[in-house]
A protein has these predicted regions:
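Nucleotidyltransferase catalytic core that binds NTPs
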Residues: 1-149
Length: 149
């Protein structure tokens, strides 16, 4: 049984993330597992990263339910220590195959002995979380940060 891990901050969960989760599901197969690991899980609300871990988890679960995709969601707190990140994260998401489109993350996991499935995303430039967050803020006509969330 293959266990595939998709790691990200998901601020917010967007189409690029959806493509990664679908690729993980395909790689895991019918008998496998998909784990979505939410980074920066300790982070509280802030204007640049407006969703809490529970809100990000709700986005992911709602999407997965609509897509009929079974997955596990776990949170991972930041430790700001790249050399020890993989060991720290593995305690939360378990062992498996990392499915990612992020080269630095892929390199970090491979250096720790992980198998990594790289996924090419054709719209990476437009499907970056910071662009999505900026667009949402620009489209909002509400100036109260709590209301805009």
């Amino acid at each position: 049984m293959t266990r595939c891990i998709v790691l990200g901050r998901f601020q917010p969960f967007h189409l690029g993330h959806a493509a990664l989760v679908k690729a993980a599901g395909k790689h895991a197969g019918a008998e496998g597992e998909v784990v979505v690991a939410i980074g920066s899980s300790q982070a509280e609300w802030e204007a640049r990263n407006p969703w809490t871990v529970s809100e990000r988890e709700a986005m992911i679960r709602t999407w997965a339910e609509q897509e009929h995709i079974a997955l596990e969601v776990v949170g991972i707190e930041d430790i700001n220590d790249p050399p020890n990140w993989v060991e720290h994260a593995t305690k939360m998401h378990g062992k498996g195959v990392l499915v990612t489109s992020d080269e630095p993350t892929a390199d970090l996991y491979e250096a720790s002995g992980w198998t990594v499935k790289r996924v090419d995303l054709s719209q990476r430039e437009t499907l970056e979380g910071w662009r999505v967050r900026q667009t949402i803020r620009m489209l909002s006509t509400v100036f109260d940060d709590d209301a805009a969330r």
